[in-house]
Amino acid sequence: MKLLQKKGYKVERPLNKGSYGTVVLAHRLFRTPRCKDLKYAIKCIKKPAYTFLQEVNILRQLSRSRHRNIIHFVESFEDNVYYYVVLEYCPLGDLYECILNNDFPNAKNQPEMIKNIFLQIIDGVAHLHSHGIYHRDLKPENFLLSLSEDGSELVVKISDFGLACRDKISYDFGTGSDRYMAPEQFEEVDGAGYSPRAADIWALGICLLNLIFARNPFTYPHEKDPIFADYMLDAMTLFDVFPTLSQDTYNVLRACLCVSPEKRSLAKTREAVLAVTKWTTDDEELESFVNEEEEFRASDFMPAEDNVRCTQSDREPLRTPSVLTPANTIQRGLLPSKLPALSDVDENISTSSSPRSPASLAPVNNSERSYDSGLGESLNNMHIGKSIATAVPVNTKRSPYSCSAPAIVFPNSIKGNKDHLKFGRSWCDMDEEDEEDIVSFGSNDDFGASDELSSKHIGLADDWNVLSQWNDNS
């Protein structure tokens, strides 16, 4: 770690830690033509790290065509123990924490803010794809946030290229984060590979649902997930999972969450986002409620024979949900903005009260290569076979308004459990004992006896901070 000082960096504090390294905040002791900013985030990756060179090569390639929605690479160097990657520092953290706390900078108009954030992510992904680079681990934790130079605009930057590749067809199954994986990426079928480009587009659809509802629609993209099995049969079951989903939002999802990879389109996704006027029907439901209240009040002055309310005979029946959760569950997301932060729990799919093995749903992997993203261990790196529990049959005769998708478990405290991420820990997951271990790193100028650090102190560098196919004619 003393090499950092020799290179002109003074460590201020740790930002993240994981199983193979740390991310620290450092400032420049002096400026150079390459390092014009004062603060940087430095990934310190313990050797050996087999994907390091590929990640750095991709970052270098992207730095030559700098894009505002891609994290900027500054430089890299190494000593006998660590690789060091110097990247721009994003002081606002990541998108996951903003969703978790329902706290976005400059969020005066939340519907427009969602559109702005998602369009920036699409533009960043389009830039990657235009250069033949495919991320394969797109999720809110890997979208860092900063402000424009004048401080008036929130800027989203795609980060963590530990699983990125240039292969148009990939055979690396089970890489990334299972809740965001495309079905063909999650599990090998008949020895066929998958398109990382199409897998990235699928992940964008899951990210959008997170952004709007703070929820994931599926626990994993496999037919043994009952909600995903229903979705494969009929994409409109999303309206059962998210009752306030607007038609505009559904049109966006039609372009990116197609079960058939060849039908996914980044250009059509962007076009549909631009056409969105509202992401949810919350306003419509509120207006309907107010109108019904007025009707009830007016009925007090009607003759008795007129004071009767009947249902319409041609009214369409309510959909029957596949997975049921408590009827009083509230879908907490960005819309509406003033709902209290509530935790939601998966039922019939996972057990939230007891920790799960991070790889309990891992697909079988024939490769012995290590796939480890900057946010944590991927399924391939666990070397544990696939074990997916068969879903328990459930009673389906309930109103769809009492149903709920498998949820991201958002704890009330930042220190809460994030076992659902399943790929290592964020800095905010550390307990007090972990913090005591790492605080000493930046306690003095030489980064605290760094030459004697053991693997106890250094962990995985989190990213800082079929059946019927989709009917496009529907």
Curated annotation (Swiss-Prot):
Q: According to its UniProt record, where is this protein located?
A: Cytoplasm; Nucleus
What the entry lists under SUPFAM superfamilies is as follows:
Protein kinase-like (PK-like)
Q: Where is this region: Disordered?
A: 345-373
Gene3D superfamilies noted in UniProt: Transferase(Phosphotransferase) domain 1
| EC id | 2.7.11.1
User: Mind telling me which PROSITE patterns this protein's record contains?
Assistant: PROTEIN_KINASE_DOM, PROTEIN_KINASE_ST
**What InterPro entries does the annotation carry?**
Kinase-like_dom_sf, Prot_kinase_dom, Ser/Thr_kinase_AS
Q: Which UniProt keywords apply?
A: ATP-binding, Cytoplasm, Kinase, Nucleotide-binding, Nucleus, Phosphoprotein, Serine/threonine-protein kinase, Transferase
Which stretches are tagged as biased composition: Low complexity? 350-363
One Pfam family recorded for the sequence: Pkinase
Q: What is the superkingdom listed in this entry's lineage?
A: Eukaryota
Q: Which residues form the Protein kinase domain?
A: 9-280
Q: Which reaction does it catalyse?
A: L-seryl-[protein] + ATP = O-phospho-L-seryl-[protein] + ADP + H(+); L-threonyl-[protein] + ATP = O-phospho-L-threonyl-[protein] + ADP + H(+)
Q: What class of enzyme is it?
A: transferase
Any Gene Ontology CC annotation: cytosol
Q: Which family does it belong to?
A: Belongs to the protein kinase superfamily. Ser/Thr protein kinase family.
- The name of this protein is Serine/threonine-protein kinase ksp1
Query: What organism, scientifically named, is this protein from?
Result: Schizosaccharomyces pombe (strain 972 / ATCC 24843)
